[in-house]
């Protein structure tokens, strides 16, 4: 209801100042607000933004500490960890510098591109970084994105997910991390510009350019297409860190061709560099290789930090199964423990599981599905039987026998066996 001083002169609904006492009085639905109250609200919002940033920047660990924490969760990829740790540290120090009002040198944002085979730890690295820094984090799949106006997700929906992760705290969301997976799938279909519209390839790259570089985006809080009449949330993406990841299948051939190691011509050795795996080839990656693959130069320019991840070998996969804080085997052991049961996996069985994952070319991601398949029947039974010890041998992994189940109650010594046997050197 409009508040009036003498039924003639309007007053501010917040500070009660009369119209002639302020420079401007802005009308809203049944309320008025003066320019002084607007300035006050703006100052409060700026102060909240500073507090949110201070909470983040005051607790930024050094690159060495970030690497040490990453080592607890991610196996191998030492060079990638080092590059990520330095990049993330510098990013949040840059925010502190910008917020201080010091404009001597303009520091640009450095987004990151991770290139590595499926299951090499790209997503896990990004997730772990967000946990270390305690900032809002969201993941998006590039394959579901299309240009605005076409069937599929708009790029603004990525920002909406970040807002949801930040519980719609705009100041906090503006300092978050966005991980875009499968970014290699939005490569344009051919190296040369096409006369037909590529709405899920080059079109998506074009749509991502602005938000990755930094812009004030209009984000639909209820999703963009089903509620066209809604009010939009304004989100500044200038300080959001974008990490893109992809397997980039086939880029090794582009690199090999460029470095004159392709098997072409009479003098070429067809088996040349067979011992040289994809990880070693990727270390020779250049910007022109990404362009030839299908990323447009403007998109590559928004990702100045590029790092490659190594292909995981058998030893690395075995380590992933058992060593990290959230190791897959430890998780299944805890599941069995909740049913008063034990899970024992022999060393030879661990090797067989790793070999299966290598054969499927699924990397670390395939380990869980292999274990889930092996333990399904056992988990189905132990919930009823209780006090059971389930032993997984190499023969069980290879499908020759069923998992061995023995009663813990009937065991004479009832001595607890090692949950994971030591792997012989």
From Swiss-Prot:
Entry annotated with the keyword Metal-binding: yes
Family note: Belongs to the ClpX chaperone family.
Matching HAMAP family: ClpX (MF_00175)
Protein name: ATP-dependent Clp protease ATP-binding subunit ClpX
Gene3D superfamilies: 1.10.8.60, ClpX chaperone, C4-type zinc finger domain (6.20.220.10), P-loop containing nucleotide triphosphate hydrolases (3.40.50.300)
Gene name for this UniProt entry: clpX
Keywords: ATP-binding, Chaperone, Metal-binding, Nucleotide-binding, Zinc
GO MF: ATP binding; ATP hydrolysis activity; ATP-dependent protein folding chaperone; protein dimerization activity; unfolded protein binding; zinc ion binding
Subunit structure: Component of the ClpX-ClpP complex. Forms a hexameric ring that, in the presence of ATP, binds to fourteen ClpP subunits assembled into a disk-like structure with a central cavity, resembling the structure of eukaryotic proteasomes.
Binding-site positions, ATP: 117-124
Domain (ClpX-type ZB) ranges: 1-53
Keyword Chaperone tagged: yes
CDD domains linked to this entry: RecA-like_ClpX
Domain of life: Bacteria
Function: ATP-dependent specificity component of the Clp protease. It directs the protease to specific substrates. Can perform chaperone functions in the absence of ClpP.
Recorded GO CC terms: HslUV protease complex
Cross-referenced NCBIfam families: clpX, PRK05342.1
Binding site for Zn(2+): 12, 15, 34, 37
SUPFAM superfamilies named in the record: Glucocorticoid receptor-like (DNA-binding domain) (SSF57716), P-loop containing nucleoside triphosphate hydrolases (SSF52540)
Biological processes annotated in GO: cell division; proteolysis involved in protein catabolic process
Record Pfam families: AAA_2, ClpB_D2-small, zf-C4_ClpX
